[in-house]
């Protein structure tokens, strides 16, 4: 279902659904589970690195970033692209972040994140997810609004010309110097980005921040909402809308099932489809089909399915 706002404030409801194939572009909500990463971000340096890595991974994955936000325990991203490009983004981000905390802390306990990739196939879901992502860090009684939150993109949309970016002024409102990535010595740039992956040389960096203006497609995001009024309606998100997004996330994370029970179901489906319970005898296409059936019938997590059908986790993520 989609919502449009006509003259005189009339609300027009339309049903729209997107079909996202493996080779077709679509919208995806990527998010991590804060309960599994309570030590994700513990200092300002962590926030800077986690923030910058969104841009680094966007530049190298092919995924287009429309909105994102960071909290101390988790990350939310709205991306546009093929499923494959979003899987690349996910893998790059998780790997780069794990390397950073391994170097900076010496221990990765409670800090490693696992991003779920949730297809957004209905327009109502898209409208809700886009704003859910940028308002979550400012909820729960926090004394800040989305357009003032430094570690998200809430300040970027439907702004008047000439407005000052959050990341290019200091607390007194004075403009800070910006520098092109290509003008920064390679070692210094690697330290800022916490990555050796390359980014376009003309991208701007200010006060250790890789500016989101370089890679967040603001125009695309604004086209989703069409008007500032529509954006404002969804920004003032109701509790029921939030709960719907949260239920989608919980549902997509899959059922936590004991391995022995999950293996039993895997063998049963394999026997029905291919006449054998030995997954090792199946080819890649058959294992992929088995993975899809396990997801459809039992809604197991991608990680558990990968271990059952003996496929790489990244491969399973592409097709379920």
Which residues are covered by each model-predicted region?
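Short beta-strand->loop micro-motif that forms the acidic, two-metal-ion catalytic signature
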Residues: 74-81
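Short Pro-Cys-Gly-centered "Cys-loop" motif that presents a nucleophilic cysteine in a tight turn
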Residues: 2-69, 82-320
């Amino acid at each position: 279902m989609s919502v449009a706002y006509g003259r005189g404030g009339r609300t027009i409801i339309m049903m729209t659904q997107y079909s996202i194939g493996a080779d077709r572009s679509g919208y995806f909500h990527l998010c991590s589970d804060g309960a599994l990463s309570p030590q994700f971000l513990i200092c300002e340096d962590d926030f800077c690195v986690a923030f910058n890595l969104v841009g680094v991974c966007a530049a190298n994955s092919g995924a287009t970033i429309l909105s994102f936000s960071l909290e101390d325990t988790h990350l939310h991203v709205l991306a546009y692209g093929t499923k494959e490009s979003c899987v690349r983004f996910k893998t790059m981000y998780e790997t780069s972040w794990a390397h950073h905390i391994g170097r900076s802390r010496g221990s990765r306990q409670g800090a490693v994140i696992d991003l779920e990739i949730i297809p957004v196939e209905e327009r109502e879901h898209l409208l809700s997810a886009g704003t859910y992502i940028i308002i979550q860090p400012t909820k729960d009684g926090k004394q800040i609004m989305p357009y003032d939150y430094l570690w998200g993109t809430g300040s970027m949309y439907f702004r008047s010309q000439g407005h000052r970016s959050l990341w290019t002024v200091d607390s007194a409102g004075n403009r800070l110097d910006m520098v092109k990535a290509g003008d920064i010595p390679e070692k210094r740039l690697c330290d800022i980005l916490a990555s050796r992956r390359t980014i376009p040389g003309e991208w701007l960096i200010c006060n250790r921040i890789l500016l989101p203006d370089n890679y967040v497609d603001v125009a695309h995001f604004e086209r989703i909402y069409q008007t500032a009024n529509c954006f404002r309606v969804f920004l003032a998100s109701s509790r029921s809308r939030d709960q719907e997004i949260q239920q989608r996330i919980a549902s997509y994370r899959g059922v936590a099932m004991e391995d022995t029970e999950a293996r039993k179901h895997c063998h049963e489906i394999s026997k029905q489809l291919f006449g054998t319970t030995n997954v090792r005898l199946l080819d890649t296409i058959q294992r992929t089909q088995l993975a899809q059936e396990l997801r459809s019938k039992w809604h197991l997590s991608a990680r558990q399915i990968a271990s059952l059908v003996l496929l790489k986790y990244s491969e399973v993520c592409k097709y379920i």
